[in-house]
């Protein structure tokens, strides 16, 4: 009887150890690819900042290994970033190109922000939503495992041209909710984005603070989609030049945390 009890205790101890070991083995995020899909807000220009730049910094600092991919390049302080941003083009244009684009650049994650380059007089929202749906379907037909983050786009002070954007954002949210997909995620870039504070003189494109805000929102959304990173860095921002307009050029001195703690 004593031997039987000891045998049972040993089995329970073994099962407990297995349970603890399995729980402790948290899955880490493997290297992944991202496609930024959109218009000039995605592409960037000489007079405003593309939010993919600060997003790159946030992902890198968090210890993720990743690549931005696409046929187009934009220069920034970290070098060049690849993307699928097309200045002056709308979501219908992206829909017409996405099949060939995604076959050439089958990213693990697609970041879609495209709601501008229409006029309110066109009553464009129904057609735009149809294009969003088609983009999703075409991408998923090529890669069923792709994760798509669709943004409710940033508001604009260029009115009445862009006065359709609030309606568009409402319909985007309804569309994503209706899809009920574990692979398509809504990102609310409109909430808290005050164009008076966050856009350049044209009242459309993000300034440095606006790009930083957009990158923060998208980074928080990505953290819910990604597994934990292997490492985390602690950047120290050093200001080495102040421009005439009060903006600054910063350099990040990045070091690895001694604890190697994943976030």
Regions found by a protein language model. Give the residues of each.
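Sec-dependent signal peptide cleavage junction
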Residues: 21-31, 230-248
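Conserved SGNH/GDSL esterase-like catalytic core that processes O-acyl groups on lipids
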Residues: 33-35, 41-130, 159-170
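Short hydrophobic segments within beta-strands
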Residues: 37-38, 69, 151, 257
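Divalent cation-coordinating acidic motifs and surrounding scaffolds
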Residues: 71-94, 186-206, 210
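Extracellular serine-dependent O-acyl
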Residues: 147-152, 164-201, 212-236
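Single conserved hydrophobic/aromatic residue that forms the stacking wall/gate
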Residues: 250-252, 256-263
């Amino acid at each position: 009887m004593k031997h039987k009890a000891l045998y049972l205790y040993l089995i329970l101890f073994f099962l407990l150890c297995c349970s603890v070991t399995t729980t402790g083995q948290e899955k880490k995020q493997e290297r992944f690819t991202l496609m930024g899909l959109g218009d000039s807000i995605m592409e960037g220009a000489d007079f405003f900042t593309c939010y993919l730049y600060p997003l790159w910094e946030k992902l890198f600092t968090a210890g993720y290994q990743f690549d931005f991919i696409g046929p187009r390049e934009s220069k920034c302080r970290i070098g060049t970033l690849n993307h699928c941003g097309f200045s002056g083009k709308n979501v219908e244009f992206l829909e017409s190109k996405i099949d060939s684009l995604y076959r050439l650049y089958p990213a693990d994650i697609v970041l879609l922000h495209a709601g501008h380059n229409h006029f309110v007089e066109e009553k464009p929202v129904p057609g735009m939503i149809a294009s969003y749906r088609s983009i999703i379907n075409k991408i998923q037909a090529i890669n069923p495992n792709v994760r798509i983050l669709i943004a409710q786009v940033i508001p604009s002070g260029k009115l009445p041209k862009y006065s359709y954007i609030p309606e568009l954002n409402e319909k985007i949210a309804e569309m994503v909710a209706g899809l009920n997909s574990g692979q398509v995620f809504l990102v609310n870039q409109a909430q808290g984005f005050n164009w008076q504070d966050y856009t350049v003189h044209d009242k459309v494109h993000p300034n440095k603070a606006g790009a930083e805000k957009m990158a923060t929102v998208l980074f928080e959304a990505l953290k819910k989609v990604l597994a934990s990173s292997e490492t985390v860095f602690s950047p120290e921002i050093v200001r080495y030049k102040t421009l005439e307009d009060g903006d600054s050029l910063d350099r990040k001195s990045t070091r690895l945390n001694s604890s190697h703690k994943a976030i």
